């Protein structure tokens, strides 16, 4: 029997900088949905990737003194690292710079051109470089800026090719009327209808003022405009034009999940492109809300951009995933707060789930030598628990199918709370004192273990490394793929032997100075510093005597990537690092242990004084030195060449 297929995508993210917690939010949503559909036994294809072309990237690369591909390669390595550490289960990672994608874009462009839907003319108008968007003057905000990002637009005049979007306006309005669920939530649909009814303009789809893009097949001096290029990734990822059987297995897509700021591109431009190509429409485009930080939009200028890798180092990936999915209603803007995260982890994961597992396994070991047995000594309270489980599973499936993820999670946690209450109501510690109640005690223990087994299945899309830990402590073999069909009562085998392990989630303690202590380890919380007033700025260290340029040229500074890091025994200040510099790996000993943990260093790019003579520190030969900044009071901070590849020269 052929399994149903399910195709889900995230936006492909723009590698102008490293990803923040908002990107992690979108991708975690998509991952939980992909895992849920695998849980249902469906054949899932989950695509994410990077949108690498455009004027913005070309300008950034030029500023850094590297080629565009060198610039994006370094950032995309961090994209992939984040998804790996966040346990994102994507089936493919598409890059628009890949040859497979170039062919799809050029073939699509040629097809639409050949049928007369593309024409050439001189374009004169307004362009937002950060958003890669064209605007009419009437569409600008009250300050004459881009209505999406509110940054200044540039006047552009160049020869361009245009896609006849206006030709398809009536078709689009009719399609949306006939398919009201195509754009979700409904508020986004109404916005798009109002936008189109103002009159669709033809879309500029090529550029000649930069060359970092896919060449237009019928006019090589042009490159493809970013959005016409980027949207086609959803076809490239499932082998459009390469493997028809595979493509038709997954197309049309079940869900394009995007941020609300790019709904217009995905619900107006994309379906018109597909219609012009003669392809079916995706089933749904869902525009989720933004993630704000402590009630304020993330911005570098405000110093409130949250690095998800730092959060994962401190709290663990599953805790971050759980908070994002549990705390936020999908269609609305959500608020990220460190305090709310800590409270949610302590209350839901440590207290509710963690304590239920710990109490259950501890009592089974104490009273029955770790063996789970159902004797059939049932009472009405057991039937209530079983009925609640059946109801919870049904409501869970309904909520997830409707993309009401936090509703599904709340339902599972209501079951967990009921199981904790069941312990108090059945009082196993009292049953254990009465030999006549021995069979009843065994059944109570079985019921708790079986509830935990089913809970582990239901939470696997959200906190995927936690479910295997529960199974292991219950003495069960962890399946290659959890299945919803196994979330039925009575599948825990009699005679199973539990195995108590470490707490699932240690409680998080917060110190007076804002640091956290998790599992005995302290993590400093570095709040964003306010801008200093002129009179508050600390005095600068005196500048050393001047040197000549030839003296400076003797220093060879290179970008290195830290592969391994460990503390040097008997030293409070030193870390021993294995650093890749181009094609070689060096041992470097650095006095940064008071400011950086070894785990923070692995995978990090650093600047190395590469031609420094070797020196022995604590008996270890150090072949280089890391470049740091100092505030004059001894505090060190590494110089961070995130966007450069290992071996690059620093000038």
Task: Give the predicted meaning of each segment.
Residues 120, 327, 332, 340-377, ...:
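Helix-rich, typically C-terminal accessory recognition domains appended to large enzymatic cores
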Residues 2-48, 100-104, 148-149, 155-366, ...:
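Structured secondary-structure scaffolds
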Residues 470-551:
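Intrinsic disorder at enzyme termini
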Residues 1-2, 35-43, 64-68, 85, ...:
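Secondary-structure transition/capping motifs at alpha-helix termini
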Residues 115-169:
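Cys/His-rich short segments
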Residues 2-75, 94-114, 131, 257, ...:
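N-terminal catalytic cores of NTP/NDP-binding nucleotidyl/phosphoryl-transfer enzymes
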